[in-house]
Amino acid sequence: MGRAFVHVILGGGVAAGYAALEFARRGGYSRGELCIISEETVAPYERPALSKGYLLPEGAARLPGFHTCVGANDELLTAKWYKENGIELVLGTKVITADVRMKTLLTATGETISYKNLIIATGARALKLEEFGISGSDASNICYLRNLDDADKLVNVMKSCPGGNAVVIGGGYIGMECAAALVTNRIKVTMVFPESHCMARLFTPKIAEYYENYYTSKGVTFVKGTVLTSFEKDSTGKVTSVILKDGKHLPADMVVVGIGIRASTGLFEGQLLMEQGGIKVNGQMLTSDGSVYAVGDVAAFPIKLFDGVIRRLEHVDSARRTARHAVAAILEPSKTKDIDYLPFFYSRVFTLSWQFYGNNTGEVVHFGDFTNSSPRFGAYWVDKSRIRGAFLEGGSREEYEAISNVVRRKAKVINIAELEKQGLMFAIQESQKDLPDGGLALGEKPTYVWHATAGVIAAASIAAFGYWYGRKRRRW
C-alpha cells in the first residue's frame, strides 16, 4: 500500500506548521497534494510553550491554545484548519527509512509515501543520560523536555512532590527555564553543570553572574564545574539522590535533564550532505538533492551576515523563518533570494527577559546597570571595529529593534571606551541614521527618548512581536 503527494513535510514541530501556513497562503498546492508526517499525535504546536506557560501551577497553557502559528500572532492551525485547507495530517506515524533517490518514505506500519518535493523538518531530539554512560536514567521521576509527552510527564512529576527537591542537570536554555518553572511550583532547585557559569555557549561570565544571583535570590542552588555520575534509588526504582563526580550526594525527589540536543538526521545520513551536525542546505534551504529541503533545527544553512559561514541554529525563530523560506523557494524559485537571516535568540524567566542578535565573537563591551532589581543591561561583541553581536536584558520594543539594527548593519565602532560609555544609546543613535554605516561620533549627545518602563518586558522576535506584544499577551 502507498500514497503519493506532491509536497511532503516530514516532522510535526514548529517548522511544519509555519511551512503549512506558507503553502496555504501562496496557494501552492491542490487539495490532497500536501501532507505532514509526524510521530506526535497532535497538529504542530509552539514548542516554547512547553518550558514556559505549560508548566505554570495555575492558568497553564494547554492545546489547542498554542498550536502554530500563534507564536507569531498569526492563525491558530488546529486539525480543523488543516482539513479545511486540504492538508493531510499523518499523525502518530514513524518513518523508518527514506530513499532520496526513489523519493519515498517507509513508515513503521509498512506504508510507502512518495513525494515530488520533501521538506525535512525532523528537528532534534534531547540527548539522554545513557549516551554519557549514566545507568538507571529510565527512572519514573527523571524528566526530559522536548515534546508534549515529556511536558505532561514533567507536570505530573512536579505535582507528585510539592515542596520537594529537584535537581536540574544542565545550565543551558532548558535547564534555566525549567529551574524557573520548578521554583514557581514551589519546588526547591539545585542546578548542576560542568561549565563555570550558566548559558556558557552565549553568556559572558558577567552576564551569567547577574542571572545566577537572581536565581539564587529565588532559592536556586548552583553546583558548577562537576557532573552527575550515578543515582541512588529506593525500592520502587525512583531516584532519591544524585551522586556527583566529586562524591557529593544531592537529595532528589525529581530530576530534570537538559544536556543538549542532537539534530535528527539519521534517515538521511549517507544520502545527503551533512555539516555542523545537521543537513547542509544552500540559501534556498535546498539540500544536495534537488527535490529535498531542510528547515529548522536539522538544517545547517549559510548566514550572509557571517560571510556565508554555515551554521545550524537551535531556536524557534530560525525554525519559523527557514520553513517559510523553503516554501517560497519551492513555489517561486526565480523570485526567492537566498535567505538573509539575522541569528536571534531570546528567553524569559521570572520577571526577566533578554534578546541576543548576531554572533558572540570578538571583544566584549558590557553596558548598563547590572545591579538594579528591574535591570536594563547588555553587551556588544566587536570584531575588526564592527558590531558582530548584541545582547540586551529588559529592553523595550524600540530598544530591541535598535540592537538588532546595529548588528545587521555591522555598525562601525571608532572608540571602544566611548562605546562602553554610551552603551545602549549607541545602538539607538545608529538606528536613527539614514546611512547604514555610521561610526560612533565621540562626545555626541543622546537624542533618543527612552520608552522602556520598569517591570516585565517580554522577549520578542523582530519579525513577530505579536508573540509577546499582541493584543492578548499569552503566558507562554
Curated annotation (Swiss-Prot):
Q: Which residues lie on this side of the membrane: Peroxisomal?
A: 25-447
GO cellular component terms listed in the entry, alphabetical order: cytoplasm; peroxisomal membrane
What induces its synthesis? Down-regulated during senescence.
Q: Which reaction does it catalyse?
A: 2 monodehydro-L-ascorbate radical + NADH + H(+) = 2 L-ascorbate + NAD(+)
Bilayer-spanning residue ranges: 4-24, 448-468
| Record keywords | FAD, Flavoprotein, Membrane, NAD, NADP, Oxidoreductase, Peroxisome, Redox-active center, Transmembrane, Transmembrane helix
Q: Which cofactor does it need?
A: FAD
Domain of life, source organism: Eukaryota
State where FAD binds: 12-15, 40, 47, 52, 146-147, 297, 316, 346
Q: Where is NADP(+) bound in this sequence?
A: 173-177, 201, 260, 314-315, 346
Where do the annotations place L-ascorbate binding? 320, 348
Cytoplasmic topological domain residue ranges: 1-3, 469-476
The molecular function GO annotations come to: monodehydroascorbate reductase (NADH) activity; oxidoreductase activity, acting on NAD(P)H
> Which residues of the sequence carry a binding annotation for NAD(+)?
171-177, 195, 201, 260, 314-315, 346
Main location per the UniProt record: membrane
Cellular localisation:
Peroxisome membrane
Q: What is its EC number?
A: 1.6.5.4
Instruction: Identify its membrane topology class.
Output: Multi-pass membrane protein
Family of the protein in this entry: Belongs to the FAD-dependent oxidoreductase family.
Q: What does this protein do?
A: Catalyzes the conversion of monodehydroascorbate to ascorbate, oxidizing NADH in the process. Ascorbate is a major antioxidant against reactive oxygen species (ROS) and nitric oxide (NO).
Q: Which PANTHER family does the record match to this protein?
A: APOPTOSIS-INDUCING FACTOR 1, RIESKE DOMAIN-CONTAINING PROTEIN-RELATED
Q: Give the protein name, as stated in the record.
A: Monodehydroascorbate reductase 2, peroxisomal
